[in-house]
C-alpha cells in the first residue's frame, strides 16, 4: 500500500473537536494507547495517532477505489443521516443511514431478493402501473415502496457484497461490524474512547458524537475514494 499525503493537520482536527472523548468513567481500557490526557473528567484523544490511522485508512480506500472496488458507508445516527447520504453519493459509495437490519450482509440472498423487489416496484411506479390498480392495492404498494426506499435506498445499486465497509459509530453499528468480521470484509471504523479498537481492521480514534468531527473524518475518506475512482477511470 503506497503512502500518500492527505492534508490531515492537527489544527483542523482540534477545531472540529476530534480530540474530545467520553468521560473517564466510560472509557474502554483498550483505548489507552490512543489517549493523551484527561481534562475536566474527559479523556482527550491523541491526535497524532488519529492522523496516522486516518492517513492509513485514506491510503487503503484510495488503493481499493483505484482497483474498482466497492464501498459501503454505515452511519445510522439520525443527526448524521444526511451527511452519510451526501458523502456516499458524492463518492459513488453504497450507504445505510436509517437502520441496519440484522443479516443485511450475512443473509445476502434475502437482501438481494428485497433489492430485486425494490427495483421492480420502482420500475412499475415510473411506468405508471400503480395508476391502473385499485386505490387500496396501489396504496399498499406505495407504502411498501416507501419503506424499501427508506431502508434500502442507499444500497439499491449494490449487486454483491461490498469490498470495504466504513463505520461511523462502532457501538451503534456493532452488528454491521460483526457481520463484516464473519464474512471477512475489511472494515474502517471511528472509535471513541469508550470503544474497542480491535473490532475493525483500521480503527480511527476520534470523537464519534460531534457532527464536525464525523464530517471531517468522513470527508477525508470519501475524498480519497473519489481520487482513487478517478485514477481507475483514467486507467481503464
Curated annotation (Swiss-Prot):
- Asked if the keyword Kinase belongs to this entry, the reply reads no
For biological process, the GO terms are: translation
Q: Where in the cell?
A: Plastid, Chloroplast
Q: Which GO terms describe its cellular component?
A: chloroplast; mitochondrial small ribosomal subunit
Entry annotated with the keyword S-adenosyl-L-methionine: no
Regions that span the bilayer: none
Q: Which Pfam families match?
A: Ribosomal_S2 (PF00318)
A GO molecular function annotation here is: structural constituent of ribosome
InterPro entries according to UniProt: Ribosomal_uS2, Ribosomal_uS2_bac/mit/plastid, Ribosomal_uS2_CS, Ribosomal_uS2_flav_dom_sf
Keyword annotations of the record: Chloroplast, Plastid, Ribonucleoprotein, Ribosomal protein
Query: Mind telling me which PROSITE patterns this protein's record contains?
Result: RIBOSOMAL_S2_1, RIBOSOMAL_S2_2
The record's section on Gene3D superfamilies has: Glucose-6-phosphate isomerase like protein, domain 1, Helix hairpin bin
- Cystine links in this protein are none
Q: Which family does it belong to?
A: Belongs to the universal ribosomal protein uS2 family.
Q: PANTHER family in the record, alphabetically? A: 30S RIBOSOMAL PROTEIN S2 PROKARYOTIC AND ORGANELLAR, SMALL RIBOSOMAL SUBUNIT PROTEIN US2M
Protein name (Swiss-Prot/TrEMBL): Small ribosomal subunit protein uS2c
The organism is Sorghum bicolor
**Gene from which this protein is expressed:** rps2
Amino acid at each position: 500500500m503506497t503512502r500518500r499525503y492527505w492534508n490531515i493537520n492537527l489544527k483542523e482536527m482540534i477545531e472540529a473537536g476530534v480530540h474530545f472523548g467520553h468521560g473517564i468513567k466510560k472509557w474502554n481500557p483498550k483505548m489507552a494507547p490512543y489517549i493523551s490526557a484527561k481534562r475536566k473528567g474527559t479523556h482527550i484523544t491523541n491526535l497524532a495517532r488519529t492522523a496516522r490511522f486516518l492517513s492509513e485508512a485514506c491510503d487503503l480506500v484510495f488503493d481499493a477505489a483505484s482497483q474498482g472496488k466497492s464501498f459501503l458507508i454505515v452511519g445510522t445516527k439520525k443527526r448524521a443521516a444526511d451527511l452519510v447520504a451526501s458523502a456516499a453519493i458524492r463518492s459513488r459509495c453504497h450507504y445505510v443511514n436509517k437502520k441496519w437490519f440484522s443479516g443485511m450482509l450475512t443473509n445476502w440472498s434475502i437482501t438481494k431478493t428485497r433489492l430485486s423487489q425494490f427495483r421492480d416496484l420502482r420500475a412499475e411506479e415510473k411506468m405508471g402501473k400503480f395508476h391502473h390498480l385499485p386505490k387500496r392495492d396501489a396504496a399498499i404498494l406505495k407504502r411498501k415502496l416507501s419503506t424499501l426506499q427508506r431502508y434500502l435506498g442507499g444500497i439499491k445499486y449494490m449487486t454483491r457484497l461490498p469490498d470495504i465497509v466504513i463505520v461511523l459509530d462502532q457501538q451503534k453499528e456493532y452488528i454491521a461490524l460483526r457481520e463484516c468480521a464473519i464474512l471477512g470484509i475489511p472494515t474502517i471504523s471511528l472509535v471513541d474512547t469508550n470503544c474497542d479498537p480491535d473490532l475493525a481492521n483500521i480503527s480511527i480514534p476520534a470523537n464519534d458524537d460531534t457532527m464536525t468531527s464525523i464530517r471531517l473524518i468522513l470527508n477525508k475518506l470519501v475524498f480519497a475514494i473519489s481520487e482513487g475512482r478517478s485514477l481507475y477511470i483514467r486507467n481503464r
